[in-house]
Amino acid sequence: MHLVYIAIFGALGCLSRFMVSGWVYALIGRALPYGTLAVNVIGSLLLGLLMEGGLRSAALPADIRMGITTGFMGGFTTFSTFSYETVRLLEDGSMVAAGANILLNVTVSVVFAGLGIFLARQL
């Protein structure tokens, strides 16, 4: 059953990523891959909150927990797109933009995962 829940939640995560990313690009533009940055940062915050705030010890069945963490969060965040977009920036000669993309995705995502854990501990 794990696979069924992971697939269902994964599909929802992918659709959510598509919608959030598109909204961010429409709002801010495409000077940098802001849509990918947004989903990675939001996903890091949510996973920190969820893991520290109750999914580990919640009375949720293991299938649902796997669906949320591996499925939804895995479908929502995207390391492969971040990597691809960074390579494209490098190929285009946009070294500063590529460096900024790496720095922002890694640093801000890690900070927001920590923030999620911190916030969950305050609840």
Curated annotation (Swiss-Prot):
Main localization of the protein?
A: membrane
Q: Where is the protein situated, by its record's location annotation?
A: Cell inner membrane
Give the GO molecular function terms. Answer: fluoride channel activity; metal ion binding
> Which parts of the chain span the membrane according to its record?
4-24, 31-51, 64-83, 100-120
GO annotation terms (biological process): cellular detoxification of fluoride
Indicate whether Repressor appears among the record's keywords. no
Annotated control of activity: Na(+) is not transported, but it plays an essential structural role and its presence is essential for fluoride channel function.
Task: Report any Pfam family annotated for this entry.
Answer: CRCB
Question: Which chemical reaction does it catalyze?
Answer: fluoride(in) = fluoride(out)
Residues bound to Na(+) are G74, T77
Its placement in the membrane is given as: Multi-pass membrane protein
- Name the UniProt key words of this record, in alphabetical order: Cell inner membrane, Cell membrane, Ion channel, Ion transport, Membrane, Metal-binding, Sodium, Transmembrane, Transmembrane helix, Transport
Q: Which InterPro entries match?
A: FluC
HAMAP family found in the cross-reference section:
FluC
Q: PANTHER family, per this entry?
A: FLUORIDE EXPORT PROTEIN 1-RELATED (PTHR28259:SF1)
Record's family?
Answer: Belongs to the fluoride channel Fluc/FEX (TC 1.A.43) family.
What is this protein's function? Fluoride-specific ion channel. Important for reducing fluoride concentration in the cell, thus reducing its toxicity.
The name on file for this protein is Fluoride-specific ion channel FluC
Annotated organism of origin: Syntrophotalea carbinolica (strain DSM 2380 / NBRC 103641 / GraBd1) (Pelobacter carbinolicus)
Upper taxonomic classification of the species? Bacteria, Pseudomonadati, Thermodesulfobacteriota, Desulfuromonadia, Desulfuromonadales
Gene designation per UniProt: fluC
